[in-house]
Amino acid sequence: MRKLDRKSVMVILMAVSCVFSFAGCQEKMEECDAKPVIYLYPESKTDVTVKLDYAGELTCTYPEYRDGWKVTASPDGTLTDADGQTYNYLYWEGENSVSYDFSSGYCVAGSDTVSFLEDALQQLGLTRQEANEFIVYWLPLMKENPYNLITFQSDVYTQAAQLSVDPTPDTVIRVFMAWKPLKDAVEIPAQDLTAPDRTGFTVVEWGGSQVR
């Protein structure tokens, strides 16, 4: 049996910690901002510092958030830390008491979740790979519900989770889905989904929160 090195053990412990933090978040009154992940796509290999000013408590981060993340980002999105460890994205999760905006959005049958998200995430500017990672994370929680009330947050979310990136990116896309399961369908004004063109150094974030 292969002996695990210290770095592998730390990664496993961090993953276990994240699982328990999410379970604890589900049991409390706070909303849980689950799996926001941050992708960095510079035009050339670049040293990048990312900081998060969050109106809540960070419960899990990977790699570990130590007064910010400092990584070397490659154009294909690969991130490398000072120890040479590589990552696909920066991950964080937290608890807050933010009241998300449900004044417009979509009421979607659970069985239609995949087709809805594929279309919506494309309109919001995610690549197929980014959308795939979003969908496989949220789909198991949504597909068996009779309906889901889905909204994509803008100012309410970005003010609660302010992102600072150095050097300054040319394009920032932040997709955050607040949603709640429903037994019956409801009427709600539809949102207008748009995205900026992805040009230059691009930063992409996606995440979500199941609201009670």
Please state what every model-predicted region is.
Residues 2-10:
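Bacterial N-terminal signal peptides that target proteins for export
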Residues 6, 26-27:
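Intrinsically disordered, low-complexity segments enriched in polar/charged residues with Gly/Pro
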Residues 9-17:
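Sec-dependent N-terminal signal peptides
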Residues 21-24:
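C-terminal motif of bacterial Sec signal peptides marking the signal peptidase cleavage site
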